Amino acid sequence: MFLLHEYDIFWAFLIISSIIPILAFLISGVLTPIREGSEKLSSYESGIEPMGNAWLQFRIRYYMFALVFVVFDVETVFLYPWAMSFDVLGISVFIEAFIFVLIPIVGLVYAWRKGALEWS
C-alpha cells in the first residue's frame, strides 16, 4: 500500500500538465471578443493579401514518400540505443531487433510491388 506514494509526483504532474492547457483554452475563449466581418473570413498568408487561388493540391506521392521516410526514421531512432548496447543484451534482443527491422522492410517491399512508390 505504501508503494503507491512513489507515484504521487507523477500523478500531480500529470494533473497539473492537463489542467494548464485546458485552463488556457477556457480563459482565451472567455476573454476573446467575438467579431464577425470580412477580415475574419479572408485567407491569411504571412500578413499579405493572397494572390490567386489560396487552395493548392499536393500529389499523394509526396505523402507516400514522407510516410516511408518517417517510418524508417523512427525505426532508426529506436535502433540506435540498441546498437550502442548490443554487446550487453545478447542474442534474444538481436532476434527481436531483426524482427523489428523486418516488419517495415516487408511493408516497403509490398508497397514497392504494388506500385505505390512509382513516381509516374
From Swiss-Prot:
One of its GO terms (cellular component) is NADH dehydrogenase complex. One of its GO terms (molecular function) is quinone binding. Its EC number is 7.1.1.-. Pfam families: Oxidored_q4. This is NAD(P)H-quinone oxidoreductase subunit 3, chloroplastic. Keywords: Chloroplast, Membrane, NAD, NADP, Plastid, Plastoquinone, Quinone, Thylakoid, Translocase, Transmembrane, Transmembrane helix, Transport. NDH is composed of at least 16 different subunits, 5 of which are encoded in the nucleus. Its main location: plastid. It catalyses: a plastoquinone + NADH + (n+1) H(+)(in) = a plastoquinol + NAD(+) + n H(+)(out); a plastoquinone + NADPH + (n+1) H(+)(in) = a plastoquinol + NADP(+) + n H(+)(out). NDH shuttles electrons from NAD(P)H:plastoquinone, via FMN and iron-sulfur (Fe-S) centers, to quinones in the photosynthetic chain and possibly in a chloroplast respiratory chain. The immediate electron acceptor for the enzyme in this species is believed to be plastoquinone. Couples the redox reaction to proton translocation, and thus conserves the redox energy in a proton gradient. One of its GO terms (biological process) is photosynthesis, light reaction. It comes from Dioscorea elephantipes (Elephant's foot yam).
